[in-house]
Amino acid sequence: MVMTNSPQNIGIKGIEVYIPGQAVNQSDLEKFDGIPQGKYTIGLGQTNMAFVNDREDIYSISLTVLSRLIKNYSIDTNKIGRLEVGTETLLDKSKSVKSVLMQLFPGNNDIEGIDTVNACYGGTSSVINAINWIESSSWDGRDAIVVAGDIAIYDKGAARPTGGVGAIALLIGPDAPIVFDSIRGSFMEHAYDFYKPDFTSEYPVVDGHFSLSCYVKAVDNCYKNYSKKITGDANKTVGVYDHFDFSAFHVPTCKLVTKSYARLLYNDYVSNPSKFADLIDETTRKHIDGLTYDESLTDKILEKTFVGLAKDETKKRVQPALQVPTNTGNMYTASAWVSLASLLYYVGSDNLKNKRISIFSYGSGLASTLLSVTVKGDVSAITKVLDFDYKLGDGRKIQSPEDYLAAIELREKAHLQKSFKPQGSTDNLSQGTYYLTEIDDKFRRAYAIKE
């Protein structure tokens, strides 16, 4: 079937987020790890970290979030023409997560899309692919779904409290209340900042300080490339306060996002210093202006200056997007989109009409994009389904650091196993959650649904 009318207002029509039933408090983790109080909570900006034991994997959390999207939005699965998955949590070097999810589409085998992998960026690449499919001559009139999710865990050490778990499912199509703007700015580069070369371990190899610089560099370049497509001038930014009403980010830590929003303001300063004439004293200005670009990526005076200048706007325009991430930790591919969902929920539909929201997505290695959406319709039905007050409250249990460590140890024992039955408890799984029951002698996985 050839579509005669081009689709309008392509965007997000539904969102479901899966947050596991267990989390560990970061203050408790500080005490347990014997490190100074505030290092995880103030230094990283994190409050709680979601985790799972050996009962859940990327297949199960993807099945859970997608099945709930289908149920909560009464989706006719025959009217889905594209399904794509973004993840970096790989169970198989050949078989895709998307192929596992086809169980949820009985009678509909004509569904395009596959898995997209590059660190935390795969979900965003999948979203862009969905938009482009609907805009193309290949579109058959059906909607698309993007699933993004990961289990982010680290070996013992400084990076461990920056983990997390979660998944998101997005229903994408025309005539949506949350509409994608046509402008995007991307930045891609070869970098060994975070990668997973060891298939015998779930843990990544991380160059922490370098990765932070890569993230900030990506923020700069994506913002410049986005702005250039609007202003026509490579040296002129759109103005973060003028162009965006709210901002969501990929959230490795909430503290990094606070600094990155301020970095957008720094780019506005470089673009038009005269706008900041009364805001920055001469000594500080001379210091900032004397920095090389590489020095600017890590300079503490620059950082402190613009974090201070952006403080009030950060609270209004960014903080709502951090409410969920600070309470779950990093969801990798789902992170930027859960940040958007958090913002929608905590700002509320009435305050979002005709507002533009920037979304910055970053994946190590590296791939990054700044895109934006405009809220053109009522999103109260979406925020009702999200129900973060319950999911972050009575919908889960805060466990001890000892319980968290025990869950991680179960996952270590389960990695790469066959002829295996998981040992973890299912007590904290919510109704409708998929969980692993067995891995047979050919590595085939079987699941049940919590009743």
From Swiss-Prot:
Protein's UniProt keywords contain Amino-acid biosynthesis: no
UniProt-listed Enzyme Commission number(s): 2.3.3.10
Enzyme class: transferase
Modifications the protein undergoes after translation, according to the UniProt entry: Is a probable target for sumoylation.
Enzymatic reactions: acetoacetyl-CoA + acetyl-CoA + H2O = (3S)-3-hydroxy-3-methylglutaryl-CoA + CoA + H(+)
Induction per the UniProt record: Expressed during exponential and stationary growth phase. Expression is repressed by amphotericin B and caspofungin. Expression is also repressed during biofilm formation.
GO MF annotations in UniProt: hydroxymethylglutaryl-CoA synthase activity
Metabolic or biological pathway, per its Swiss-Prot or TrEMBL entry: Metabolic intermediate biosynthesis; (R)-mevalonate biosynthesis; (R)-mevalonate from acetyl-CoA: step 2/3
Annotated (3S)-3-hydroxy-3-methylglutaryl-CoA binding sites: C120, T162, S211, H250, K259, N330, S364
Gene Ontology biological process terms from the UniProt entry: acetyl-CoA metabolic process; cellular response to starvation; ergosterol biosynthetic process; farnesyl diphosphate biosynthetic process, mevalonate pathway; filamentous growth; filamentous growth of a population of unicellular organisms in response to biotic stimulus; filamentous growth of a population of unicellular organisms in response to starvation
UniProt KW Cell division keyword: no
Record: active site: E88 (proton donor/acceptor), C120 (acyl-thioester intermediate), H250 (proton donor/acceptor)
Keywords: Lipid biosynthesis, Lipid metabolism, Steroid biosynthesis, Steroid metabolism, Sterol biosynthesis, Sterol metabolism, Transferase, Ubl conjugation
Role this protein plays: Hydroxymethylglutaryl-CoA synthase; part of the first module of ergosterol biosynthesis pathway that includes the early steps of the pathway, conserved across all eukaryotes, and which results in the formation of mevalonate from acetyl-coenzyme A (acetyl-CoA). ERG13 condenses acetyl-CoA with acetoacetyl-CoA to form hydroxymethylglutaryl-CoA (HMG-CoA). The first module starts with the action of the cytosolic acetyl-CoA acetyltransferase ERG10 that catalyzes the formation of acetoacetyl-CoA.
Cited PANTHER family: 3-HYDROXY-3-METHYLGLUTARYL COENZYME A SYNTHASE (PTHR43323), HYDROXYMETHYLGLUTARYL-COA SYNTHASE (PTHR43323:SF2)
Assigned protein family: Belongs to the thiolase-like superfamily. HMG-CoA synthase family.
Protein name: Hydroxymethylglutaryl-CoA synthase
Organism whose genome encodes this protein: Candida albicans (strain SC5314 / ATCC MYA-2876)
Gene: ERG13
